[in-house]
From Swiss-Prot:
(6R)-10-formyltetrahydrofolate binds at residues 114, 136-140. GO terms for molecular function: carboxy-lyase activity; UDP-4-amino-4-deoxy-L-arabinose formyltransferase activity; UDP-glucuronate dehydrogenase activity. Bifunctional enzyme that catalyzes the oxidative decarboxylation of UDP-glucuronic acid (UDP-GlcUA) to UDP-4-keto-arabinose (UDP-Ara4O) and the addition of a formyl group to UDP-4-amino-4-deoxy-L-arabinose (UDP-L-Ara4N) to form UDP-L-4-formamido-arabinose (UDP-L-Ara4FN). The modified arabinose is attached to lipid A and is required for resistance to polymyxin and cationic antimicrobial peptides. One of its GO terms (biological process) is response to antibiotic. The record marks 140 as: Raises pKa of active site His. CDD domains: Arna_FMT_C, Arna_like_SDR_e. The active site is at residues 104, 434, 619. Keywords: Antibiotic resistance, Lipid A biosynthesis, Lipid biosynthesis, Lipid metabolism, Lipopolysaccharide biosynthesis, Multifunctional enzyme, NAD, Oxidoreductase, Transferase. This is Bifunctional polymyxin resistance protein ArnA. It comes from the Bacteria. HAMAP family: ArnA.
């Protein structure tokens, strides 16, 4: 039986080895590239696969149609997921006739979701386990194939329980995989009434509340002990981490957070005292409790506290879905530059936002909006402003995958809009300049211009009409149910991190990235239909400043408004853009590392995009609404934008790749 495996971490290594031992043929393994910001104390699936001579891949988005097609070509009989961190699309789950199966680190249906290992310790459970279950669209909700219980000892911490679960997983897989290979796959439906769901844990969740019962504080220490980030508290402004502790007898009449003694180091909780056995001050070394007290300058009677507040006013919480995208990562940077904003984000990757992952006001979860509905609903309820930025927005995908464009761009985003209506949250929705379609106005006005698209047999319009329909639904919710909204329409924003050269290689990128790839690889620049189509190119910095002002919404002037964000002065044809780009390329200091210019090549849009494509001659915005509502005016010249975008991509090319 041929298997394709998705795996990561120690559990991934155990799963791969168990599948091999059971006599399966492994066609390929999909894993993750290690994150430099993460403590990778665990085994490497990629090294294991390489040593076994098995093809291994680590795509940023395994659910992209390109990868779905490649997995389909492998023709797997069965699919396994062992601690792979991204949920798999239904397209992938349906590729294997025998089904797709996931190993989860709890006794389902309890502790669905993220970090069950840590959550069971936080909650003081005495038992957990591992479960192999059939994969369905909803996370961890499929029929149970087999499970194995694991007792949690009172002295277990996260790492010891992790090792127990790995052993239990191997025993479970050794027992059930041969049976499954013969076609005998047990299936027991989960009882939804018993289901519990837990989200991802973040380092800041380790902050100790000394007003909690001592058992609760001790369990938190156990749950996040090394190599996890640790439970922590503050002595004044000095942070310290507790790595191990024990529960002591009652501390009657002592205020929670008070130091009872320094040798041993004991701190009062709500109903007892926590003895700190080992700990660490700041970024120092791990020491015993009494030495930690000395390092911190603690004396009996001192009070430990929460971190000092920077302001008495609660920060504005902004939820960005698609935070790793072009607009999302630049907007995050702008918001975090202001002290009064906190950003919550979800995306299927984190390469563009890696620079924010350790920021105390940035909270990120890696996930898919089509799957993590519980997390999204919770955070819509929690946050003040919601920006659903997830969309397929590259023209070649409109003709290649029109149904997927509709499902993601309309159906999934409609669900998020309905959450905003339900919890009465403000939504700032990214419409698109594409909604104007083949409008004949000299400049497109948000409130007056007609929205004109082509015939049904031209699927390139699926993106435009999906966005337009959502615009109309949002408007109706505002009129009929009081939804607070602003629609913004970007006009050809450009800048660093627009997309990637690897996306351009498979044709799934914006125009300028494709042109830069041609220059980098020494291939002809393709001018679709001669490149005479005109667009108004807008610098990402100008665009983000306008979007930031929409979020600020001074005087509520943006409520119920549609706002074009573009630079009418930066109008140019694609051919003019290519010529300007070539001129900047020839002057760049890295020019000598790349091949000679291969010339321009005129290509028919039908041959490039497919028969379902139809282009637009011009697209120029009226920005009167932006001027009136935002006091905004774009200021960055197109040449500056082109040069900065080009520089970013050229410096991202590996030196060895340049030389080749």
């Amino acid at each position: 039986m041929k298997a394709v495996i998705f795996a990561y971490h120690d559990m991934g290594c155990q799963g791969v080895q168990a599948v091999l031992d059971a006599g399966y043929e492994i066609a390929a393994i999909f894993t993750h590239a290690d994150n430099p910001a993460e403590n990778t104390f665990f085994g490497s699936v990629s090294r294991l696969a390489a040593g076994l001579g098995i093809p291994v891949y680590a795509p940023d988005n395994v659910n992209h149609p390109i990868w779905v097609d490649r997995i389909a070509e492998l023709a797997p009989d069965i699919i396994f997921s062992f601690y792979y961190r991204n949920l798999l699309s239904e397209e992938i789950l349906h590729l294997a006739p025998a089904g797709a199966f996931n190993l989860h680190g709890s006794l389902l249906p309890a502790y669905r979701g993220r970090a069950p290992l840590n959550w069971v310790l936080v909650n003081g459970e005495s038992e957990t386990g591992v479960t192999l279950h059939r994969m369905v669209k909803r996370a961890d909700a499929g029929e149970i194939v087999a499970s194995q219980r694991v007792a949690i000892a009172q002295d277990d911490v996260a790492l010891t329980l992790h090792h127990k679960l790995c052993q239990a997983a191997r025993q479970l897989l050794n027992s059930i995989l041969p049976t499954m290979k013969c076609g005998d796959i047990p299936s027991v439906p989960q009882r939804e009434s018993d289901a519990t769901y837990y989200g991802r844990r973040r380092p800041e969740d380790g902050l100790i509340d000394w007003h909690k019962p001592v058992s609760t504080v001790h369990n938190l220490v156990r749950a996040v002990a090394a190599p996890w980030p640790g439970a922590f508290s503050y002595n004044g402004s000095q942070k310290f981490t507790i790595w191990s502790s024990r529960i002591c007898p009652d501390a009657q009449g002592v205020l929670p957070g008070s130091v009872i003694s320094v040798s041993p180091l004991r701190v009062a909780c709500a109903d007892g005292a926590l003895e700190i056995i080992t700990g660490q001050a700041g970024d120092g070394i791990t020491v015993q409790g009494s030495q930690l007290a000395q390092t911190l300058g603690l004396v009996a009677g001192a009070r430990l506290n929460r971190p000092p507040a920077t302001s008495g006013k609660r920060r504005i919480r902004v939820l960005i879905l698609g935070v790793n995208g072009f607009i999302g990562n630049h907007l995050t940077e702008r918001l975090l530059n202001e002290e009064n904003y906190e950003v919550y984000g979800m995306d299927i990757g984190s390469n563009a936002i890696s620079r924010f992952l350790l920021h105390p006001r940035f909270h990120f979860v890696e996930g898919d909006i089509s799957i993590h509905s519980e997390w999204i609903e919770y955070h819509v309820k929690k946050c003040d402003v919601v920006l659903p930025l997830v969309a397929i927005a590259t023209p070649i995908e409109y003709t290649r995958n029109p149904l997927r464009v509709f499902e993601l761009d309309f159906e999934e985003n409609l669900r998020i809009i309905r959450y905003c209506v339900k919890y009465r949250k403000r939504v700032v929705f990214p419409s698109t300049s594409e909604v104007y379609g083949m409008c004949t106005d000299a400049s497109f006005d948000e409130d007056k211009s007609n929205l004109i698209v082509g015939p049904v047999n031209k699927p390139r319009w699926i993106y435009s009409v999906s966005k337009q329909l959502l615009d109309r639904v949002i408007w109706a919710y505002g009129e009929k149910e009081g939804l607070r909204f602003t629609l913004f329409r970007p006009f050809n924003w450009m800048g660093p991190r627009l997309d990637s050269l690897s996306a351009a290689r498979i044709g799934s990128s914006r125009a300028i990235t494709q042109l830069i790839l041609n220059l980098v690889e020494g291939t002809p620049i393709k001018l679709i239909d001669g490149g005479q189509q005109k667009r108004c190119f807008t610098d990402i910095r100008d665009g983000i400043e306008a979007l930031f002002r929409i979020i600020v919404n001074e005087g509520d002037r943006c409520d119920g408004k549609i706002i074009n964000i573009g630079n009418p002065d930066n109008e140019a044809s694609i051919q003019e853009l290519a010529t300007l780009l070539l001129d900047s390329f020839d002057k760049h200091p890295l020019r000598c590392h790349f091949p000679p210019f291969a010339g321009f090549q005129v290509v028919a849009s039908r041959s490039y995009y497919g028969k379902g494509y139809q282009d637009v001659a011009h697209r120029k915005p009226s920005i009167d609404n932006a001027r009136r509502c935002l006091g905004w005016e774009p200021s960055i010249a197109m040449r500056d934008t082109v040069e900065e975008t080009l520089d970013f991509f050229l410096r991202s090319v590996d030196v060895a790749e340049r030389a080749s």
